[in-house]
Regions:
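Extended, low-hydrophobicity, polar/charged segments
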Residues: 1-160
Length: 160
C-alpha cells in the first residue's frame, strides 16, 4: 500500500497476525460505491466480496452482519442467529456514531465497540474474502477463518 495510512481495521489484523492484502478501487472522494461495483472494479467474483451491515435488535443492542455483496440479509434469520425477536437496519446517519466508520467504508473489524458479529455461513466456502478496511476505496483480502477470528465473529445462514 505504500505510504497510505493504515486504518484501525488494518492495525487490528496485524496485531492478530492475520495475513492480508489491501486492494484499492476507483471511487469519487467520500462517495460510497455499491459492493457489486466494487467487486467488478477489482476483477473479483462478487461471491467473495462481503459487505458489513449494522442492525439494532428489539433489545436495543447493536449487531453486525457480514454477507456477500450481491446477497440480501434475511432479517428474521439474522435475528434468530443472535437470539433477538427482531433486528432492523440502522439509519445511514447513525453508522458513524455507532461504528466509527462511514457508509461504504464499514469494516467488521475495528469498530468503536465490539458488537456481536455474524458472517453468513457462505464465507466458509471461500478461499479468500474481501471486506472494507474502514475507508471508501480500499478493501482488505484475507482467509475467511482468520477474518472471522479477528472480528470475534460467528457464522450462520443469514441470507435468502
Amino acid at each position: 500500500m505504500g505510504k497510505e495510512a493504515k486504518t484501525n481495521a488494518m492495525r487490528i489484523l496485524e496485531r492478530e497476525k492475520v495475513a492480508y492484502t489491501a486492494h484499492e478501487y476507483p471511487h469519487e472522494e467520500g462517495v460510497a460505491v455499491d459492493g457489486v461495483t466494487v467487486a467488478a472494479s477489482m476483477g473479483e467474483d462478487p461471491a467473495c466480496v462481503y459487505k458489513t451491515l449494522v442492525t439494532q435488535g428489539s433489545s436495543k443492542n447493536y449487531f453486525v452482519f457480514v454477507i456477500p455483496v450481491a446477497a440480501e440479509l434475511d432479517l428474521k434469520a439474522a435475528a434468530r442467529s443472535v437470539g433477538e425477536k427482531s433486528v432492523a437496519m440502522i439509519h445511514v446517519a447513525e453508522i458513524n456514531k455507532v461504528t466509527g466508520y462511514v457508509r461504504g467504508g464499514c469494516s467488521p473489524v475495528g469498530m468503536k465497540k465490539q458488537y456481536r458479529t455474524v458472517f453468513d455461513e457462505s464465507v466458509l466456502t471461500q478461499q479468500k474474502v474481501y471486506v472494507s478496511c474502514g475507508r471508501i476505496g480500499t478493501q482488505v483480502c484475507c482467509a475467511p477463518a482468520d477474518l472471522i477470528r479477528a472480528a470475534r465473529a460467528a457464522t450462520a445462514k443469514i441470507i435468502f
